[in-house]
Amino acid sequence: MILPINTYSDEVLHQKAKPLKGVDADISSLIDSMFESMENASGIGLAAPQVGCSIRLLVLDVSCMKSYEDVPPMVVINPNVLAVRGKNLMEEGCLSVPGVQGDVLRPSEITLKYRDRNFQEHTEEFSGMLARVLQHEIDHLNGTLFVDRMEKRDRRRIQQELDDIAAGLVPADYPIARECSRGGEGPACM
């Protein structure tokens, strides 16, 4: 099922998400819907708060990108960044901030502890685009958007676009949730 994407001003995007205690049929169904919604929106990563569910779950699929064709889609539950290395400034965008891009400085490598779709624990090192996408999506789980990490002067330049998104004036090629306050209580989050 394709789920609507929450945008910039929706409250659920500014809250710290709650950890999952396991994966049941409802969470498994949510994971499938998140992959379907991400693909429908031509995204490479999607965090549960973006679909109105305040839980520590994200999905990503970077296989559409050159050099990442062999990377399988990932389900990441309860992620914890254990270490970071290096720095890299790169332009980012986000399904929750349609039509806006901006430069964000992030660590270029991370060590991540997380659980997969089967709730099995992993500790792995990630670099390059995969590290960036993971950090971007983990930010969503902590109530942070990429625009919150932009330089102040760059953020001021896009403020009108952010105001337009908040006012519902910016269209997207995928379903957008308006005035969504499910915050983890909607049917997709059960």
Curated annotation (Swiss-Prot):
Domain of life assignment: Bacteria
GO biological processes: co-translational protein modification; translation
Required cofactor(s): Fe(2+)
Catalytic residues in the record: E137
A Pfam family the protein falls into: Pep_deformylase
EC code: 3.5.1.88
InterPro entries: Peptide_deformylase (IPR023635), Peptide_deformylase_sf (IPR036821)
Cofactor remark: Binds 1 Fe(2+) ion.
Binding site for Fe cation: C94, H136, H140
UniProt keyword list: Hydrolase, Iron, Metal-binding, Protein biosynthesis
Keyword Nucleotide-binding: no
GO molecular function, one term: metal ion binding
Reaction(s) catalysed by this chain's protein: N-terminal N-formyl-L-methionyl-[peptide] + H2O = N-terminal L-methionyl-[peptide] + formate
Keyword Transmembrane applies: no
Family per similarity comment: Belongs to the polypeptide deformylase family.
Function, in words: Removes the formyl group from the N-terminal Met of newly synthesized proteins. Requires at least a dipeptide for an efficient rate of reaction. N-terminal L-methionine is a prerequisite for activity but the enzyme has broad specificity at other positions.
Protein name, entry field: Peptide deformylase
Organism of this sequence: Chlorobium luteolum (strain DSM 273 / BCRC 81028 / 2530) (Pelodictyon luteolum)
Gene: def
